[in-house]
UniProtKB/Swiss-Prot annotation:
This is Protein FAM27E3. Residues 77-99 have a biased composition (Basic and acidic residues). Belongs to the FAM27 family. Residues 1-113 are annotated as: Disordered. It comes from Homo sapiens (Human). Residues 100-113 have a biased composition (Basic residues).
Length: 113
């Protein structure tokens, strides 16, 4: 068996430590249909890899915090909460308390000790 026959055999990589060490399984990163990927898909994958690498670099240098707090904004109001916060109720309170109590303009009082 000549060297070119070995190279032509798909299971054996020409870039290994030696030509005569066949790979047990040609391991692929993602997806078993990499041969059937379109150029656009390949470019998208490459772009995602690049972005991930950039993000990892930023994370390592402490520029971005990891997104661990992902459970925000998932609170659903109960019926009681909902009816307590209806617009009609707030309007009534506003009428009783005087106008513009919903704005934060005159909350701070200046006191000299």
């Amino acid at each position: 068996m000549g060297i070119f026959q070995l190279l032509r055999d798909r299971r054996i990589s020409s870039r290994g430590p030696g030509l005569h060490t066949p790979k047990a399984e040609p391991r692929r990163r993602k997806g078993l249909t990499t041969g059937l990927m379109t150029q656009a898909e390949r470019q998208k994958q490459a772009h995602q890899r690049q972005a991930a690498m950039r993000e990892t670099a930023l994370w390592c240098t402490g520029h971005i915090r990891p997104r661990t707090h992902t459970h925000t904004g998932t609170h659903t109001q109960t019926d009681r909460e909902r009816e307590r916060n209806t617009q009609r109720l707030r309007d009534r309170e506003r009428r009783e308390n005087g106008r513009h109590t919903h704005t934060y303009t005159h909350r701070h009082t200046h006191r000299v000790l």
